[in-house]
């Protein structure tokens, strides 16, 4: 088919010489079989060859590079502001309905508890979560009561993201919080490994002193304990209060961050908050023990493992179930302090997959005391009459320096906290309530299908 793309042909057709009748486009197409390609919209001549034919011609002519060029990636389309507003309003509306439903359910649970009926672990968690959400509404209500204060609400939510109840939290923010917690725990795990912990057992008998001395002599020589039973018996000598009262401030801060606590305040305040968190874990251990871990749903199982410092991301449900049962076994059957278990999970964070690994991590925690503290403990292990007065004087001066430092922190603190909470006394009550029999975690590990998924 003839194409008139050259400039002389175009001028001859549309601007003929004087005395020559111009050819209309219809006659030109029907008789001369010429395709007109003048674009009236853009007032320019266009090629009548399709784009696909152009590419074929280029490739046949040997121009392979231009044909094989990758088209640039299209940018993501911007969501209109109206759509964003509708999505945000729908999210807050759903959160308000969810909060109203939680208040309705929790009010029934509160009436049930006031009537004297016991609440299950799931009901206690629901009541606690709703109470925390209602408390969060108190500062949020100030923005609605004070005139024009709602204009500052976006800035307040940016600075304090936990100002709103948990029902308004989006899935993206929840994932960001979990990711930040995982990164923090990885970092704190390294800090706990590198920082030596300064704690030692107190008020132990002569037989326990001999066991303690034999354990450290064998471990420092071979790197492993004589038996697992020996490791458990030595770990029982370190009570929660003994550990928390003798660790340094960097270790306290790392421990608080690992347990998802804000590390602000003096050492006394940090110890009190860690003790309170440990007490909640002890009670939760007993609740899971009585109700059996098999009754937990998958989301509840992940939450329970995460609160104990056990990795719960990218882990099979059967492995999570095994790790939780191992924790309960070491906590309630072996009666190992929760503080040491938290440190053990921090030592091998993300690698708690067998009983040997967690017991080995517990051994690493006990080995991690410094040499000078080991010599100090060795003085306490032998009879008091054999200890020199110089060694006792050095130990007493160290305790005096710690007390002076804590007193100075309390003087500079705005809020004074009196730490009278004793985990050891609470531990005696919890251990007395737990029967000394094989707990549920001694049963064979179930499959992932046995775990109920909501």
From Swiss-Prot:
Q: Which residues lie on this side of the membrane: Mitochondrial intermembrane?
A: 46-136
First-listed, main subcellular location of the protein, grouped into a coarse class: mitochondrion
Q: Which residues fall in a coiled-coil region?
A: 376-423
Residue ranges under compositional bias (Basic and acidic residues)? 420-430, 437-454
At the top level, the lineage of the source is: Eukaryota
Where's it found, cell-wise?
A: Mitochondrion inner membrane
Q: Where is the signal peptide?
A: none
Do you know which InterPro entries this protein is assigned to?
LETM1-like_RBD, LETM1/MDM38-like
For the Letm1 RBD domain, which residue ranges apply? 177-371
Region of interest (Disordered), ranges: 51-73, 420-454
| Mitochondrial matrix-side positions | 158-454
User: What is the topology of this protein in the membrane according to its UniProt annotation?
Assistant: Single-pass membrane protein
GO CC annotations?
mitochondrial inner membrane; mitochondrion
Q: Give the record's keywords alphabetically.
A: Coiled coil, Membrane, Mitochondrion, Mitochondrion inner membrane, Transit peptide, Transmembrane, Transmembrane helix
What is the extent of the transit peptide? 1-45
Q: Where are the transmembrane segments?
A: 137-157
Q: Please list the GO terms describing molecular function.
A: ribosome binding
The extra comment attached to this record reads:
Present with 11300 molecules/cell in log phase SD medium.
Recorded protein name is LETM1 domain-containing protein YLH47, mitochondrial
Q: Which organism is it from?
A: Saccharomyces cerevisiae (strain ATCC 204508 / S288c) (Baker's yeast)
Q: What is the lineage of its organism?
A: Eukaryota, Fungi, Dikarya, Ascomycota, Saccharomycotina
